[in-house]
Each structure stands twice: as structure tokens, then as C-alpha cells.
Amino acid sequence: MTVLYLRVNLIASLDGTEKKTMTPQTSRAVSQAPSPLLRQTVGSIAVLTLDSPSTRNALSEAMIMALQSALDSIRDDKSVRAVVIAANGPAYSSGHNLKELTARRSDADKGRAYFAHMMKSCSDMMQTIVRLPKPVVAAVQGVATAAGCQMVATCDLAVASDQATFGTPGIDIGLFCSTPMVALTRNVPRKHAMHMLLTGDHIPAQRALELGLVNSVVPAGSEREAAIALADRIAVKSAYTLKVGKEAFYRQAEMSLADAYTYAAQVMTENMMARDAQEGIGAFIEKRDPKWEDR
């Protein structure tokens, strides 16, 4: 099993713009700001770890950019077959960095343009998770609130520590969790989602499991290993079939029943013509393990 650690860095260029790069963790240049995100390769699994415990792994501008950069690089990387998003420290993610946002109220427009930029950047990153042609599993070890809870809901699957908690407490500070609401209402029954949004109450891991926000709850300290094991189980499947299936899953969910069946029938017909479907069906009939070509 190959294990490789990388740190996703944002390097300031001479013209003041930022360039996204992937550099070895051990060779950080003096000009590089410490990255809030680590990337670890475990076999065919890319493990992205939020690594800013001092900010409770807030989804700061740097964190969002690092996640976006990492996900973009993974998209066409054939060596990566699944992704795990984990975190270091006591919190999974506390959501947006409120101090960072508040600091922009001194802008001429009182921060409006920056706030719009941040909300769009975060929303784009969340949609990248959904559209990534590879399964993404959250490994939640602690508190996941606001946009942090949103990211858990956005991931295809989620494994939680029995000490993890989840909430959308924006209502308590006069800021309704509108963008987290999008992911939450698509993964949790509506009245329960509304309860979380209106009260700001945190729910424990077991309740999150009952509501469908997470797939499993494991003893504290084993959530990362469990998430990697789950991702590994999926990674042995045909990458082509996983790509087709994930895209179809999210697209049909937005359609009417009739349109969804029409679309799904078309997808399944095309899938039947794929080399891996021929191989998989043949292997099943011949009682042997399939040899995927990912096409």
C-alpha cells in the first residue's frame, strides 16, 4: 500500500495573484504560506485532511481554494479511485471563518463583493464534490457546523465518530444558514432539516445516523480508518461504472418521476454497451472475478 503526503499550497506570485500548487509537505519554501489542507494517498484513495485546528478547520478563503485545487487535480487523476475528506483537531469544520468575513466590513462596499465571492467560491467547491466522477466520503471526528455540516451533507457518504456533533447554528448569530440549507434539505427529511435551521440545535452522531446525514457511526478515533476502508471497498469497482452511476444518481433526483425513468433507461442502455458491463456480466456468468478496463 502506497502512502504519500502532500500539502496543498497557495503561492503568492509577483503580480499579487495566487497560484494553486501541489508541493511535498517537507519542501515548503519560505515564501509559501502554511496550507490548511493536507493530501495523503493511501493506495488508490486520496485523503484530504483539513489541517487548521486553531480555526476549528474553518472554511476560510485559503481552505476553500485548497480544497477546490485538490479536487480539480483529482478529477482526471486515474490513480485516484475514491476520496476521503477528514480533519485534524477537535472540530471537523466550524464553517466559514467569521473573523475573516467581518474584517471586510471596512471595505468601501462594507464587504458585499467579498461576501458574494466567498459564498460563490464555497458553493462552487461543494458542487465540485457532487460532480466529481469519483465517490467522496466524509470522515467526521468532531463538531461539524454551518458550512462544515454542509460539506458532510454534500459528500456522497459519511462516517462519523460517536463523539461527532452536527448543527446549523447561524440563526443564533443572525445569519440563517442558507447555503448549508441546500445540502441539508437534500439529505435530511424536511421537517428535521427545518428544525436544525430554525433552532440552531446540535445533534449527536447517532441522531445524524437516524436522519440519514451520515451512513455509519464508529468509536471515536476509528472514523478515518473506517472511511478509508469504505472508500477502498468502492474503489475496486469499475471506475467507469462509478462515474456513470454517481452522475445519474444526482441528475435523476432533480427530475420528475417520468423524466427520471426515461433518463435512467437511457443511462442503463449506454452502460450496457460499455466494455466493463460486458466484462462484469461475463465474469458473473463464468463465476470469476472481473477485470475492469474502466471503459
Set out the residue ranges of the language-model regions.
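C-terminal alpha-helix plus adjacent terminal tail
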Residues: V3-Y5, N9-G43, G200-Q206, G221-E225, ...
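Conserved CoA-thioester-binding segment of acyl-CoA-metabolizing enzymes
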Residues: V8-N88, Q127
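Crotonase-fold acyl-CoA enzyme core
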Residues: Q127-L242, A274, E279-G282, R288
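Catalytic-core regions built around general acid/base machinery
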Residues: A70, S121-L132
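Hydrophobic alpha-helical membrane-association signature
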Residues: M63-A66, M118-S121, E223, A264
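Glycine- (often His-adjacent) and acidic-residue-rich active-site loop
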Residues: A87-M125, A144, S256
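Terminal peptide-recognition signature
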Residues: L48, S52, L67, I85, ...
